[in-house]
Amino acid sequence: MKEYQVYLERDRSRQQDFLYPLIFREYIYGLAYSHDFNRSSFVENVGYDNKFSLLIVKRLITRMYQQNHLIISANDSNKNPFLGYNXNFYSQIISEGFAIVVEIPFFLQLSSSLEEAEIVKSYQNLRSIHSIFPFLEDKFTYLNYVSDIRIPYPIHLEILVQILRYWVKDAPFFHLLRLFLYNFCNWNSFSTPKSTFSKSNPRLFLFLYNFYVCEYESIFLFLRKKSSHLRLKSFSVFFERIFFYAKREHLVEVFAKDFSSTLTFFNDPLIHYVRYQGKSILASKNGPLVMNKWKHYCIHLWQCFFDIWSQPGTIHINQLSEHSFHLLGYFSNVRLNRSVVRSQMLQNTFLIEIVSKKLDIIVPIIPLIRSLAKAKFCNVLRDPISKPVWGDSSDFDIIERFLRICRNLSHYYNGSSKKKSLYRIKYILRLSCIKTLACKHKTTVRAFLKRSGSEELLEEFFTEEEGILSLIFPRASSTLQRLHRNRIWYLDILFSNDLVNHE
């Protein structure tokens, strides 16, 4: 128990002070206002204008200095107590400023943990969406049961602020944060991805949501480490950046005194946890009994610690060999491969059946076709159609738009074990591009291709990937052919294409 107490004492020393003065720095709001809102992958794009005006920021700072932040007029509820008018505009800038300031201590902690783990160079690859799939290929073939968990949401804003206080020691900062949340959103309501608060304040909402998930995972992984002597080195970068606060001391003492036998029963060195897009996967080699124990632990953790009601029926436990789970735009399951080997010993011949497991990752063709139909590239019968709204663009811009979509889908789904579905998607986009060009020139598809000779240009839909791989492996044709059959994971994909988000 002493090593846990030392760890907690060290974490308390890293708490940050004096964030409140940073709220009134001009450059904070300059960074906030020039932030690219369209890079958000969790909430819908809000579409703010990214023009920057230092004069507007200076006026904002001046008016914030002149206001008395401790007095709220109850008779004038429609008027902004901070600035008097244009509440939505200033709410957006102030919330972005809050998010930038509060991200500073967590960024410093993450940077120090990366330096201690000596994996700064590989941090960019760990941010990739595809970095999760090589881990699944290495680990999931040895596991038997999987549990799909949807992280419960919403959570009350007051609970988030209280949890945040254990990380940052700055009372004026949190008073101002509470005042801001009270005036610019409904304090008694819950924060959800589709709420007005999350749409108008995307960066602050994303920070609060990610902080809530980080807090939940820190407790979950703390007990995971406590219940096993083996460390999960595969995800050390994510574990090392999680810091515990003084509130855990009581938790450590309780589990050490009263629940030691229970934790021994939980001991499972082959349990793995993966989180993605508000969901998580818990997989284990042991039977369903241990998985049920972890399931009920998660439910009690959400109900008791975060005051979120969650029912046991929302978490399903399935056998990997008989269940396909939807993961980041893929259908994934563990397939059993059976092979028969003939063995001969003296005059006797034996037939030995060997069963091996392989992670099968497939492109979900039906949801992807549905996304193409929703984007008006084809109809519900999978027949390509033209895109008349792009008719005002030049031929080069139209072809470039289709190629960009095809390129993004090709890169994202190149890890599929069966690529025939991907070729079908390329075929639909290719014909949709041809029909769009023919509709623009008011002619038929056959006449357009015959007149303009665009067949060679449109072959880029199928030859671009081959050209990229030929540059990487210029002298190995056999290697190139093998790469087309195998999976290729790209470690530079930070945001998924809009057509991929069909879950």
Curated annotation (Swiss-Prot):
GO CC term, one of those recorded: chloroplast
Alphabetical list of Pfam families matching this protein: Intron_maturas2, MatK_N
GO molecular function, one term: RNA binding
InterPro entries, alphabetized: Domain_X, Maturase_MatK, Maturase_MatK_N
Main location class: plastid
GO biological process entries: mRNA processing; RNA splicing; tRNA processing
UniProtKB keywords: Chloroplast, mRNA processing, Plastid, RNA-binding, tRNA processing
Localisation: Plastid, Chloroplast
Domain of life per record: Eukaryota
Similarity comment text for this entry: Belongs to the intron maturase 2 family. MatK subfamily.
Function: Usually encoded in the trnK tRNA gene intron. Probably assists in splicing its own and other chloroplast group II introns.
The protein's name in its UniProt record: Maturase K
Species for this entry: Caragana arborescens (Siberian pea tree)
